[in-house]
């Protein structure tokens, strides 16, 4: 999970914006 979250933070720093970071966190919580 930490690896996924780390990648999400990388996307968050990308031009996509913080929305991608929030989406990743939601996916982490949604997945078991």
From Swiss-Prot:
It holds the Pfam family ANP. The keyword Secreted applies. It is found in: Secreted. Its main location: secreted. GO terms for biological process: blood vessel diameter maintenance; regulation of blood pressure; vasodilation. Expressed by the venom gland. The keyword Cytoplasm does not apply. InterPro entries: Natr_peptide, Natr_peptide_CS, Natriuretic_peptide_brain. Coiled coil: none annotated. Disulfide bonds join 8-24. GO terms for cellular component: extracellular region. It comes from the Eukaryota. Keywords: Disulfide bond, Hypotensive agent, Secreted, Toxin, Vasoactive, Vasodilator. GO terms for molecular function: hormone activity; toxin activity. The hypotensive effect is not mediated by the natriuretic peptide receptor-A (NPR1). Snake venom natriuretic peptide that exhibits hypotensive and vasorelaxant effects. Produces a dose-dependent hypotension in rats, followed by significant increases in concentrations of markers of nitric oxide (NO) formation measured in the plasma and vasorelaxation in a thoracic aortic ring bath. The peptide may exert its hypotensive action, at least in part, through stimulation of NO production. The vasorelaxant effect is endothelium-dependent and does not appear to be mediated by the natriuretic peptide receptor-A, as its action is not modified by isatin (a potent NPR1 antagonist). Belongs to the natriuretic peptide family. Snake NP subfamily. This is Natriuretic peptide Coa_NP2. It comes from Crotalus lutosus abyssus.
């Amino acid at each position: 999970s930490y690896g996924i979250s780390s990648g999400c933070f990388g996307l968050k720093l990308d031009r996509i914006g913080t929305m991608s970071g929030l989406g990743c966190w939601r996916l982490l919580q949604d997945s078991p």
